[in-house]
Amino acid sequence: MPQHIAFAGITGNQLFRWLENHKYCGRCGSKMIKSENERAMVCSECGQIIYPTISPAVTVAITNGDKILLARNARGNFTKFALVAGFVEIGESFEETVKREVMEEVGLKVKNIRYYKSQPWAFSDTEMIGFFVELDGDDHVTIQEDEIAEARWFSREELSDDLPQLSLSFEMIETFRCNKHR
């Protein structure tokens, strides 16, 4: 299935879930109706407007010369390695989130934070914002065990060339593998 078709289906599912979860106003309990002017729900009584929930999150490619740090999530049945990622907190910039998430999840300091690109991720109502960063100091990894099951440095040669291109994380890993991230 072409990627754009898959994303259209996933996005449709995201909108369906949003509509199903916002039938009634959280302020006064009245029925919500679809706005005629924009993608929003409007309370039929108090006029409160609710927009689709989109949570910003970062995904971070941590590089150390010719190596990249990949981690495996401790939650769920994740068997593949991916990039370090996490949600932006209230009052936090994307760059601050990058530094905090990397320090929390793998105990590393990073520098030279460079924006790569973003991707809507409808599975979790998220907008993923991708960054490449460089290790700043010691490369010893200390994982946050409730978040990360395993993390380690991979050389380009150790990275598979058949990664699924559906997620931004895997696209960024492939970009690093092909040495196109600079």
Regions found by a protein language model. Name each.
Residues A82-K117, F131:
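The catalytic Nudix box helix
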Residues M1-H22, F78-F81, F123, E145-R182:
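Nudix hydrolase/Nudix homology domain
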Residues Q119-T142:
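Active-site-adjacent beta-strand/loop module that shapes the phosphate/pyrophosphate-binding cleft
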Residues R72-N73, A85, R114-Q119, L135, ...:
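Active-site proximal loops enriched in glycine and acidic residues that flank catalytic Cys/His/Asp
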Residues T11-A61:
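Cys/His-rich short segments
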